[in-house]
A protein has these predicted regions:
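Conserved catalytic core of sirtuin-type NAD+-dependent deacylases
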Residues: 1-142
Length: 142
């Protein structure tokens, strides 16, 4: 079976209504990337980071995969397709794609602040006081 490797970015999900980071009026317009997308940013201001990603997670629940997502999933019938995405949404998965690597993490996953390996599926808002089984604060898997 022939292999196809796809590198996807913000453009594929923008078509579904996901706000991108670098557009005019984009998500980074009001925030420095290091303030909302780094462990150091979370340590400095966890409330900002949690609210930023809670808003993104809510937005994600209001959109659906678009034709491009479905076409890539459909290719799996005839090819060994691997998708490497810079996106943190789950639109590739919801369209039916299976072999996906998220370079920058995933909105619907969280992890303890002190553990890069333990990753937990998370659908709801994440708040201060949401802890793992060991009592460690959870943070977005971004």
């Amino acid at each position: 079976m022939k292999k196809i490797v796809v590198l996807s970015g913000a453009g594929i999900s923008a078509e579904s209504g996901i706000k991108t980071f670098r557009d005019s009026n984009g998500l980074w317009e009001n925030h420095k990337i290091e303030d909302v997308a780094s462990p150091e940013g979370f340590a400095r201001n966890p409330e900002l980071v949690l609210e930023f990603y809670n808003l993104r997670r809510r937005q994600l629940s209001e959109v659906n995969p678009n034709e491009a997502h479905y076409i890539l999933a459909e290719l799996q019938k005839d090819f060994d397709v691997h998708i490497i995405t810079q996106n943190v949404d789950d639109l590739h998965e919801r369209a039916g794609s299976e072999n996906i690597i998220h370079l920058h993490g995933e909105l619907k996953k969280v992890r303890p602040v002190n553990d890069e390996e333990s990753i937990i599926l998370w659908e709801d808002d994440l708040n201060l006081g949401d802890l793992d089984e060991n009592g460690i604060q959870l943070r977005p898997h971004i």
